[in-house]
């Protein structure tokens, strides 16, 4: 923070980044409010949201991954669409992109999603 004192926010993109960012900020001489966002709903990350060290955690809806995978496998095996050779561009019942949604956790909604943390 000494090199870039105008930094207003830092984002982390894996489950360990929130801890690393907050540890780095605690050990720096930063004297202004720096917004922190990170990925993955992990217990340590939720505690950092609760303490106010992290502003937002973005979580994936992991249960939806399994649902869509099972649904697509079912469609492959029970669809009227024939999947002959996907490598040569035949029609597929599997979409190119599947949006599974995200959960945004902050101090305002933390206990709504995780009431046992109260």
Task: Give the ranges of each region predicted by the language model.
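Hydrophobic alpha-helical
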Residues: 1-48
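Second-shell loop/turn segments in exported
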Residues: 5-8, 56-59, 100
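A ligand-binding cleft/hinge motif common to bilobed small-molecule-binding domains
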Residues: 27-28, 64-67
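A generic structural signal for alpha->beta connector loops
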Residues: 33, 53-54, 101
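Residues at the C-termini of beta-strands that transition into short coil/loop
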Residues: 40, 61, 108
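Short, charged, surface-exposed secondary-structure boundary motifs
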Residues: 46-47, 66-70
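Hinge/cleft segment of the Venus flytrap/periplasmic-binding protein
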Residues: 68-118
């Amino acid at each position: 923070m000494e090199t870039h004192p105008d930094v207003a926010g830092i984002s982390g993109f894996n489950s360990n980044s929130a801890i690393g960012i907050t540890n780095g900020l605690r050990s720096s001489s930063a004297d202004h409010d720096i917004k922190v966002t990170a990925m993955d709903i992990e217990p340590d990350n939720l505690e950092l949201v609760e303490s106010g060290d992290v502003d937002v955690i973005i979580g994936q809806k992991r249960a939806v991954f399994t649902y869509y995978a099972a649904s697509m496998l079912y469609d492959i095996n029970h669809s009227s669409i024939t999947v002959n050779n996907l490598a040569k561009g035949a029609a597929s019942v599997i979409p190119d992109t599947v949006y599974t949604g995200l959960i945004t956790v902050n101090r305002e909604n933390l206990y709504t999603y995780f009431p046992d943390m109260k």
